[in-house]
Amino acid sequence: MASWFRSKKFVEAKYKEAKENLLTKYGELGFRDAIIVADSVVPHNEQDVNIYISIEEGQKYYIRNIEWVGNTLYPTDVLNKLLQMKKGDVYNQTLMNERLMTDEDAVGNLYYNNGYVFSRIDPVETNIVGDSIDLEMRIFEGPQARISHVRISGNDRVYENVIRRELRNKPGDLFSREAL
């Protein structure tokens, strides 16, 4: 815990954040049910405090199966390759969410870069047997979006036509986050 408290002063808000970070870290290690069952901050002397945290880790979980539902545009093997998680891997919800939506080469970006800005991927735990979790990735692809208008403002030194010429996204094109 000491690495989370760099300041010399105990701050309640940072302590709460540190406890959340601790549980997140447990989740990344496969302990999705980890909870803090007790914690206390006890003054040691006038300058220091002792922090006691009792954690119930619960079961460590692994991925048993990953099934994709609703993917009509891209085959399952392409989505699995982008997800980079497979049977037997430690169940890491943080990594899964990053691989689905936030990483540069995430599954969601495959859809976004091809105009599917309204797409959504909902990971659902469908079955838990012992230490194994079955996942169902529910994809709602939605309609493709096109760029209807590009507004340019604040250009004092460069003519608008020069800026428009350099744009990769033009009106009528499919939306692509990558091309922005």
Residue spans for each PLM region:
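Interaction-mediating elements
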Residues: 1-180
